[in-house]
Amino acid sequence: MAAKPLLLPLLLLLHLSITLAQNDTNALTLFRLQTDTHGNLAGNWTGSDACTSSWQGVSCSPSSHRVTELSLPSLSLRGPLTSLSSLDQLRLLDLHDNRLNGTVSPLTNCKNLRLVYLAGNDLSGEIPKEISFLKRMIRLDLSDNNIRGVIPREILGFTRVLTIRIQNNELTGRIPDFSQMKSLLELNVSFNELHGNVSDGVVKKFGDLSFSGNEGLCGSDPLPVCTITNDPESSNTDQIVPSNPTSIPHSPVSVREPEIHSHRGIKPGIIAAVIGGCVAVIVLVSFGFAFCCGRLDRNGERSKSGSVETGFVGGGEGKRRSSYGEGGESDATSATDRSRLVFFERRKQFELDDLLKASAEMLGKGSLGTVYKAVLDDGSTTVAVKRLKDANPCPRKEFEQYMEIIGRLKHQNVVKLRAYYYAKEEKLLVYEYLPNGSLHSLLHGNRGPGRIPLDWTTRISLMLGAARGLAKIHDEYSISKIPHGNIKSSNVLLDRNGVALIADFGLSLLLNPVHAIARLGGYRAPEQSEIKRLSQKADVYSFGVLLLEVLTGKAPSIFPSPSRPRSAASVAVEEEEEAVVDLPKWVRSVVKEEWTAEVFDPELLRYKNIEEEMVAMLHIGLACVVPQPEKRPTMAEVVKMVEEIRVEQSPVGEDFDESRNSMSPSLATTDG
């Protein structure tokens, strides 16, 4: 008889558990209805229970049947997070690279959250003070959104957090004292509008790049020196501000070129350049602000790669021409409009004059122009500047439209266009500078003694980052179908943390399609030989070639057809006799002959227990390079496939997600 009183509570608990599980399913169903406008989840999210029906991206607790993980990255989801507020057992939320909007406030009800990845969305509003309720938080990534307001001091209450990424937002106010967060291993607040003092220890721990793009921040070198001034909002308190008055937060979109002034302690060569600049200013005033500081010689010799010049566009001996040309059509804009940088951020970063006087190191030349590393006189600002060739005549209005397309795209795996300068004879694009070079140099550079091989973990992490960047481009322009147009290993760059970013987006729009396709070389899709057109499907093909390049270690040029095994003695004769094929055809032929192991880069074969992952990646690459465009996967599908390839890494505890950092022993950080 004693068992009967116990039966009722057990039944009540069972009923409660079923009810809560059903509530989770209802919440996810509402989330899909509110956000899945493209129907990406409709075919899989069927059945009455999210857990027992194995819904895509949903993981549940085996015991309670409650939802514990929701991972739906890069699915073009658009809408608010409101319906997720009832998922109180949720531990991991990964919705990066979608188009989600609204605020993050609903998540403060999810008290068990540990890992939150919401980068690359359209979230706005403020970071709520109630975020401190998430006591178990380990990684928080809200980067590349439109979040405003101050960083709440309550965030310092996180005791287990390892990572906080809130860069590329619109955050304002005083920066909190992050030195109080002893567990914090990674912090990035760059490119916001924060002000205040950053302690020496914090700068050393997280690096100065984690605070760049905030003109109001000050502290130890390379940040501006802090000075104490009277707070304009309160006469009773002092305010710490940078000693440089131009560093006080403000938000102009574009800045006019100031008068050139002298600097104490400048070298004689720079003094001469400044004097020349003053003469140029007089010419500008007289002739409608035609270019300030001279130009590099277009027809004569240019500085070799790696040389350093005093002045970014100064010192050339080539013919100088008026911005109005010789009897040609003049620009419709006023002279003053031609003398300014146009920024895509809400605050001024530097003046055109600063850029023109910066020391410049040529990084390389391409079909569109020359790329320089420019270090401004303040010593703390380094950017990459591309000078477009004159072979790209583009009306101002059309050029500005292209720049708007490129500049409005924000994503952690796409190189950010910070500003541009337009004049009829001079076009400059200013990008963030990435110090670790390109994937091409890592794969093919220094193949001799002393080379540090690029390990498998790094390769798959870099390809996943590149795939996410390209998927974001395709999703952002899914209606207009704007492609990248030039996917290749030299356009996959690495930042200081070893994260891959896609470069050169949109610049193919400035070229004639025939010329744009010609520069693709071995990355060109087969249909582009007949139909001279750039497309997103052709991008997928190029990405597939890139995958094969990473797997084989071979550049996408021509290779002997492996019609039979070749001995060392017969190599020379056979190379003359055998037909040559491109990289995808070469890989297919080797696989067809069942010599799959010969496909892979010998540097990879020394690693154990990765054969399945390499073969899986090979299948993804081959799926991307099928000759028929309509049979190729979308980049969103490619991202999913790459994410499913598991790489053995060194976890640090139950909730440590090492895959969010691409850095590996084969990738050393440099300042380039």
From Swiss-Prot:
Sequence intervals crossing the membrane: 270-290
Stored InterPro entries: Kinase-like_dom_sf (IPR011009), Leu-rich_rpt (IPR001611), LRR_dom_sf (IPR032675), LRR_N_plant-typ (IPR013210), PRK1-6/SRF4-like (IPR046959), Prot_kinase_dom (IPR000719)
Positions bearing the Glycyl lysine isopeptide (Lys-Gly) (interchain with G-Cter in ubiquitin) cross-link: 111
Residue spans of biased composition, Polar residues class: 233-249, 661-672
GO molecular function, one term: protein kinase activity
Keyword Metal-binding part of the UniProt annotation: no
Glycosylation sites per record: 23, 44, 101, 188, 197
Alphabetical list of Pfam families matching this protein: LRR_1 (PF00560), LRRNT_2 (PF08263), Pkinase (PF00069)
Cytoplasmic side: 291-672
Expressing tissues: Expressed in the vascular strands of cotyledons, the shoot apex, hypocotyls, roots, leaves, stems and flowers.
Topological domain ranges for the Extracellular compartment: 22-269
Cellular compartment(s): Cell membrane
Topology of the protein relative to the lipid bilayer: Single-pass type I membrane protein
Gene3D superfamilies (alphabetical): Phosphorylase Kinase, domain 1, Ribonuclease Inhibitor, Transferase(Phosphotransferase) domain 1
Gene Ontology CC entries for this record: plasma membrane
Residue ranges of LRR repeats: 87-110, 112-134, 135-158, 160-181, 182-205
Stretch list, region Disordered: 233-254, 300-333, 650-672
Source species, domain of life: Eukaryota
Binding, ATP: 363-371, 386
Domain Protein kinase as annotated: residue spans: 357-645
Biological process per Gene Ontology, one example term: plant-type secondary cell wall biogenesis
Role according to the record: Leucine-rich repeat receptor-like protein kinase involved in secondary cell wall formation in xylem fibers. May play a role in a regulatory network which also incorporates the TDR/PXY signaling pathway and regulates the maturation of interfascicular fiber cells. May promote the initiation of secondary cell wall deposition during the procedure of cell expansion.
Domain notes: The protein kinase domain is predicted to be catalytically inactive.
Protein known as: Leucine-rich repeat receptor-like protein kinase PXC1
Naturally occurring in which organism (per UniProt): Arabidopsis thaliana
